[in-house]
Amino acid sequence: MRTIKIESEFDAIVCVFDALNYLQNFEELKLSFENIKRALKPNGFFLFDILNRKMIDSMFPEDIFADDRENMSIIWKHSYEEEIDLDKISASFFIREEKNSYKRYDEVFYKKIYSGKLILQVIKDTGFELISKEVNTEIAGPRMVYLLKRVD
């Protein structure tokens, strides 16, 4: 998103599953919005979701939890890394390969939690109009969902 250069223009762009939270500072977030605006036709729409502090804290109330599914289990660990102002999430996936055999995969990623005020500032600074802002709790936990319109 930070470096995307698309020659085509689109009527709408969708960015879900809190992908914007992976942008680790304000400059990256603003640059991504500018790139998305360039890829939209005039009056085009940008739909995205993003986590806020309350939402990520509700996802990790104990900072560790296990998720047991039919063919895999996941152990999630969460911590807030104050010195870098990012949330660190570690996930250990145990994928069933045979009847009693599992293969382990580990992943660590960082998420930046942006305030609603900062999101609104980026929207304004990059030439979008806020059409709606709602909470969606139906897919993969609670997320703020924004619908923007490109204005010129």
Language model features: what each stretch is:
Residues 47-118:
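SAM-dependent methyltransferase
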Residues 10, 85-87, 141-144:
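A short, glycine/Asx- and small/polar-enriched loop/turn
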Residues 2-13:
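A short acidic, Gly/Pro-enriched loop at the edge of an enzyme's catalytic core
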Residues 110-152:
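C-terminal lobe and adjacent flexible extensions of AdoMet/dcAdoMet transferase-like proteins
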Residues 11-28:
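A short SAM/SAH-binding and catalytic strip from SAM-dependent methyltransferases
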